């Protein structure tokens, strides 16, 4: 289910997945198939980690990478879940091909 909340987002962020919802900044973004695919990849990640462990892992990885990079945005870009989603967002068939726990291989540079 896709929801729209214009005032929910910080700076340039436009989408967020909170299982089972995709939350967008603007109604027109519903037509952005690449963004929707990116967020669907996150929904799959959340589902396979049984939701709560996903968020714990995501925040922990972001904190560790923030310490490593000393840059919170670079840390965000390098979270394994984000790497997988960004790397595969243009492949609209990715979720049909994706193997279980695929995000693991993105813990290290791809």
Identify the function of each model-found stretch.
Residues 40-55:
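Catalytic Zn2+-binding segment of zinc metalloproteases
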Residues 30, 34-39, 43, 91-93:
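Membrane-interface extramembranous regions at the lipid-water interface
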Residues 3-33:
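Active-site scaffold of zinc-dependent metalloenzymes
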Residues 2-13, 53-110:
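Metalloprotease/metallohydrolase-associated module, dominated by Zn2+-dependent proteases
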Residues 16, 34, 47-50, 79, ...:
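A structural signal for well-ordered alpha-helical segments within the folded catalytic domains
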């Amino acid at each position: 289910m896709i929801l729209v909340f214009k005032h929910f987002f910080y700076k340039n962020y436009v989408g967020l997945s909170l299982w089972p919802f995709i939350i967008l900044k603007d109604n027109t973004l519903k037509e952005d198939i690449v963004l929707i695919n990116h967020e669907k990849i996150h929904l799959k990640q959340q589902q396979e980690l049984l939701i709560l462990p996903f968020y714990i892992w995501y925040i922990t990885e972001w904190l560790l990478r923030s310490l490593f990079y000393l840059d919170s945005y670079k840390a965000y870009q390098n979270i394994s879940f984000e790497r997988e989603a960004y790397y595969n967002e243009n492949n609209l068939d990715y979720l049909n091909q994706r193997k279980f726990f695929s995000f693991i291989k993105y813990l290290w540079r791809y």
